Swiss-Prot record:
This is Regulatory protein E2. The lineage of its organism: Viruses, Monodnaviria, Shotokuvirae, Cossaviricota, Papovaviricetes. Keywords: Activator, DNA replication, DNA-binding, Early protein, Host nucleus, Phosphoprotein, Repressor, Transcription, Transcription regulation. It is found in: Host nucleus. GO terms for cellular component: host cell nucleus. Residues 280-289 have a biased composition (Polar residues). Residues 203-339 are annotated as: Disordered. Phosphorylated.
Length: 435
C-alpha cells in the first residue's frame, strides 16, 4: 500500500503516543496524576487504532491494528478508568502511592468490583476436611470504594465462616466472597473449614449447603446469617455453644451427608478392634531372643550392633560424585584436580547467565521491549533500557544497544526461535559473570 501524507501523519501521531507511554513505563512513577495521564494516552492510542482500521490500515509501525470492536471496547475501558481515577484524585487518598498494577482494569473489576485495592493476602478454605480439596481467596487489607455522593471511603476486609467482606460507612457488611457458592461445586458433604491468620473457623454443628436461592441463610444456627451474625474466632467458642444449638436442630431432619459420615465411622470400627486384638501377639514376638539381639545391634551400644551402623553410614554417604550447580550465578568452588586448567575455566563459565546484545534504533528497541514484555514475558529473565556507548571511537558504534538476560541457555534458544526481531535490529550472543 502506497503511503500517503494522511498515513504519515497518522503514523507520526501514533509514534508520539507510544513515546509518552514508554516514558511512563520506564519512570514507573507512583503518582495518581501520572495514572490519569496514562489512561488518557491509552484512550488516544485506541482511537488511532480505530481510525486506522476504518481506513483499511492493518499495521502502524510494529503494531498490528486490532478490529474496530476491540479498539472501541478498550477505549471505553480507558475512559471509565480515567473517570474513576480523576474522582479519586479529588479525595484524601490522592497522596497515596498508586502503581500501574493497582489501577489496572483487571484489579479494579476483580471482587469486590469497582473498587481499588491494596495489601492483598489469602485465606484458605478446606472442603470436607480434605487438605487436597482446598481453595485460596483474596483478602484485601485496604478497599477504596465510592458511594452515591461521589465520596471515597477506605475499608478493611474481614473473614468469617460465611465468606470475605468489608464494612461500609453505614456499618453494613458487604460480602464479595461466599464460601457456600464454591461448596456447592467442590464439596460432597457440604462442610468446610476456614484457615486465616493461624485461626481455624468452623461451624458449631455439621453444616450442609441447602439448595435454592436462600442457601446462605441458616436460621437454625442463628450465628452465620450475613445480616446479624457474630464472627467466630476459635474452636473453643463453638464447643461452648453446642448445647444451645443442639436443641434447635432437634426437629430438623438429618441430612444424607451426615448419615453417610456416620456409616463410614461405624464401618471402620471393626478393623480398629481387630488391630487391638492382634497387638498382644505382636508384642509377644518382640520378646524373642533373636529380636532382643537385633535391638542391641540397632542401638549401637552392644557388641554386635556398632559395626552395622558404621557400614550403613559409609554406604550412604561415601563415594558421591561431585555435582556442578546449575542455578543462575552458581559456580563450583574449584575444578577437579584431574582436569586441565582450560577445562576448569569452561566449567566455571558454563554457569554464567547468558545474554543477547541487541543493536538498532532507539524507538525500535523500545517498542520491541514493550511488545515482548506483553507477548512473551516467560521467554526471558529481564531487559535493560536502550543505551549507547559514551566514548565513540568509531562510527560503527553509533547505534543504540539493549541487553536481554536469560536464566539459562535453553531459555535463550527458545527466545531466538519464538521471538522475531524487528527489521534493522541485530543481536550477538554473550554471557556475564552476574546480573
Amino acid at each position: 500500500m502506497q503511503r500517503t501524507p494522511r498515513m504519515e501523519n497518522l503514523q507520526a501521531r501514533f509514534d508520539a503516543v507510544q513515546d509518552q507511554l514508554i516514558d511512563i513505563y520506564e519512570k514507573d512513577t507512583r503518582s495518581l496524576e501520572v495514572q490519569v495521564t496514562y489512561w488518557n494516552l491509552i484512550r488516544r492510542e485506541q482511537a488511532l487504532f480505530y481510525y486506522a482500521r476504518q481506513q483499511g490500515i492493518t499495521r502502524l509501525g510494529l503494531y498490528q491494528v486490532p478490529l474496530t470492536s476491540v479498539s472501541e471496547r478498550k477505549a471505553k475501558e480507558a475512559i471509565k478508568m480515567s473517570m474513576y481515577l480523576t474522582s479519586l484524585q479529588k479525595s484524601p487518598f490522592a497522596q497515596l502511592s498508586w502503581s500501574l498494577s493497582e489501577t489496572s482494569p483487571e484489579m479494579f473489576f476483580a471482587p469486590p468490583e469497582s473498587t481499588f485495592k491494596k495489601k492483598g493476602s489469602h485465606v484458605t478454605v478446606v472442603y470436607d476436611k480434605d487438605s487436597n480439596n482446598a481453595m485460596e481467596y483474596a483478602v484485601w487489607g485496604e478497599v477504596f470504594y465510592v458511594d452515591e455522593t461521589d465520596t471515597w471511603h477506605k475499608a478493611q476486609s474481614k473473614v468469617d465462616y460465611d465468606g470475605v467482606y468489608y464494612t461500609d460507612a453505614e456499618g453494613k457488611k458487604v460480602y464479595y466472597v461466599h464460601f457456600a457458592d464454591d461448596a456447592a461445586h467442590y464439596s460432597v458433604l457440604g462442610q468446610w473449614e476456614v484457615h486465616f491468620e493461624n485461626n481455624v473457623l468452623s461451624p458449631p454443628v455439621t453444616s450442609s449447603f441447602p439448595g435454592g436461592p436462600g442457601r446462605r441463610q441458616r436460621p437454625q444456627t442463628g450465628s452465620y446469617s450475613p445480616g446479624h451474625k457474630a464472627p467466630v474466632t476459635s474452636r473453643r467458642r463453638h464447643s461452648s455453644s453446642s448445647d444451645s444449638h443442639s436443641s434447635r436442630r432437634g426437629s430438623r431432619p438429618q441430612s444424607l451427608s451426615r448419615s453417610r459420615s456416620r456409616s463410614r465411622s461405624r464401618s471402620r470400627s471393626p478393623s480398629g478392634s481387630h488391630a487391638r486384638q492382634r497387638a498382644p501377639q505382636d508384642s509377644g514376638t518382640n520378646k524373642s531372643p533373636g529380636r532382643q539381639g537385633g535391638r542391641r545391634g540397632d542401638g549401637g551400644g552392644g557388641r554386635g550392633g556398632g559395626g552395622g551402623g558404621v557400614r550403613v553410614r559409609e554406604d550412604t554417604f561415601g563415594g558421591q560424585p561431585t555435582q556442578i550447580a546449575g542455578r543462575l550465578g552458581d559456580r563450583p568452588a574449584k575444578a577437579p584436580e584431574q582436569t586441565s586448567r582450560r577445562l576448569a575455566q569452561l566449567i566455571e563459565s558454563a554457569n554464567d547467565p547468558p545474554v543477547l546484545l541487541l543493536q538498532g534504533c532507539a524507538n525500535t528497541l523500545k517498542c520491541f521491549r514493550r511488545r515482548t514484555s506483553h507477548a512473551h514475558p516467560h521467554k526471558f529473565l529481564c531487559m535493560s533500557t536502550s543505551w549507547t556507548w559514551s566514548c565513540k571511537t568509531t562510527t560503527h558504534k553509533s547505534c543504540h544497544r539493549m541487553l536481554v538476560a536469560f536464566s539459562d541457555y535453553e531459555q535463550r534458544r527458545c527466545f531466538l526461535a519464538g521471538v522475531k526481531l524487528p527489521k534493522g535490529v541485530t543481536c550477538v550472543k554473550g554471557s556475564l559473570e552476574a546480573l
